[in-house]
Amino acid sequence: MDGDRGKRDSYWSTSPSGSTTKPASGWERSSKADTWLLILSFTQWALSIATVIICIIISARQGYSMKEYSMTVEALNMSSREVKESLTSLIRQEVIARAVNIQSSVQTGIPVLLNKNSRDVIQMIDKSCSRQELTQHCESTIAVHHADGIAPLEPHSFWRCPVGEPYLSSDPEISLLPGPSLLSGSTTISGCVRLPSLSIGEAIYAYSSNLITQGCADIGKSYQVLQLGYISLNSDMFPDLNPVVSHTYDINDNRKSCSVVATGTRGYQLCSMPTVDERTDYSSDGIEDLVLDVLDLKGRTKSHRYRNSEVDLDHPFSALYPSVGNGIATEGSLIFLGYGGLTTPLQGDTKCRTQGCQQVSQDTCNEALKITWLGGKQVVSVIIQVNDYLSERPKIRVTTIPITQNYLGAEGRLLKLGDRVYIYTRSSGWHSQLQIGVLDVSHPLTINWTPHEALSRPGNKECNWYNKCPKECISGVYTDAYPLSPDAANVATVTLYANTSRVNPTIMYSNTTNIINMLRIKDVQLEAAYTTTSCITHFGKGYCFHIIEINQKSLNTLQPMLFKTSIPKLCKAES
């Protein structure tokens, strides 16, 4: 052990160079500790100074960064506001555009698509029901009806206002409404399509016209075309006539002077089947055959023909014709207006006017009913009643309208609107002014005529537009009117606005004393003939269909054309 300690002491007392080192004293050790402490203090001070400098530098840099940060935040805020405004504007535009599209779809697109889908379903049902497979056969009727809200215009409901009184306005002027026309026409020239007759029922409408292949003579061989359809709304939200089925009757049957009625899901057509011309017919005893045609929505048709002996006539007639204008349906009966010549004249005093007329008496008016051109026969209007029209063989009864209630018998029509029956007759005699009133079909038959001073029709020189004094004449033209007010004082019509010529067809809305609003179809030289006007409402808004026989000179043909207008009814506020 001692040997090892000697070795260790020898090791620590000898330098690496081989010299011997002496042990350090206590003072020397204290001096070294102070030196190291000084060094540490200086280092700490230096570090503190460096730390302060670094903090100052960092603070300075942080101040600049905060300012830059504030500017950056402000720029970001401005950019955000701009983006927000841009997005808001874009969203607003998109919302408005989509709202307009939605509104357009709701108002127009959806109804059109619904109508199209309805027609597609109807066609599909029709095709499936027309098939016969083994013993199965579909007999159901196609569900066809007017668009929602559409109904024949009923004056009692239409001619009223929530506040104030209704009136016809002259401002703005009426205009033609756009839409298609699907009236039956001709495939040849130099012929005529004549005598349009339109009946608008609660569910469907019926339209009939006569197609003469060559010329326009009444006795010329002709097709009779009967259409059934419904009233829809087009993309402009205006009403249209849309035919569903059409039937063309044999040209060899030669139907003439047809009147129609639409009721339920069927159309009925009453026609004359003359074998001679009109003058020859009036000169002989007995009437030409009548025929009642029935057409349903599946295109099935049935016809009932009646000879003179099969018609229950209240008086002997030499000639009898349906009145061209539409008839009406009541419980168990169809009622048509007719006219014709009595074999033996009735006694009594007819409607007359003597005031302001020279050398005129009641006898003048009575004799004016006997038309020399028609063999001197007394021409009267009649009610043709088809009883039990749903039976296998309906019965026809004819009742003469008393001459005391009427002017010269002529073409015309009946309208059942609400609880009233309105009658129009063509002003064929000396009385040139519009003839429209309310008919009481009870016994005895009576007519309450509404005097109209503003509306008339062209006629021959002796019985022109302005004639008011009684004399024998047969003239005028069929231009019926539709009552807008319950008393038939306010009407819609198409008049040939001329003195003696069948020219210048003009749509007119009028009261008893003034033409309020009118629209000329083209110009005063345009030739035309018969006109018929029928009106409807769509959720209270009134529209009229006007069918006018227009002379197509370039094709040498006469053909009906369809026009539509909106009724210019307004409400006058109470003062």
UniProtKB/Swiss-Prot annotation:
Region Incorporation in virion, residue ranges: 10-14
Biological process (GO), any one: virion attachment to host cell
Keywords: Disulfide bond, Glycoprotein, Hemagglutinin, Host cell membrane, Host membrane, Host-virus interaction, Hydrolase, Membrane, Signal-anchor, Transmembrane, Transmembrane helix, Viral attachment to host cell, Viral envelope protein, Virion, Virus entry into host cell
Pfam families referenced in this protein's UniProt entry, alphabetically: HN
Mutation effect (residue 77 to G): Loss of glycosylation
Comp. bias (Basic and acidic residues): 1-10
EC number: 3.2.1.18
Outcome (variant: residue 499 to G): Loss of glycosylation; 88% loss of neuraminidase activity
Membrane-spanning parts: 38-58
InterPro entries reported for this sequence: Hemagglutn-neuramid (IPR016285), Hemagglutn/HN (IPR000665), Sialidase_sf (IPR036278)
Cell location: Virion membrane; Host cell membrane
CDD domains referenced in this protein's UniProt entry, alphabetically: HN (cd15469)
Disulfide bonds: 192-216, 258-271, 357-469, 463-473, 535-544
Spans within the Virion surface topological domain: 59-575
Any one GO molecular-function label of the UniProt entry: exo-alpha-sialidase activity
One GO CC term, this protein: membrane
Function of the molecule: Attaches the virus to sialic acid-containing cell receptors and thereby initiating infection. Binding of HN protein to the receptor induces a conformational change that allows the F protein to trigger virion/cell membranes fusion.
Subunit-level organization: Homotetramer; composed of disulfide-linked homodimers. Interacts with F protein trimer.
Protein name: Hemagglutinin-neuraminidase
Species this protein is from: Sendai virus (strain Z) (SeV)
Gene (name only): HN
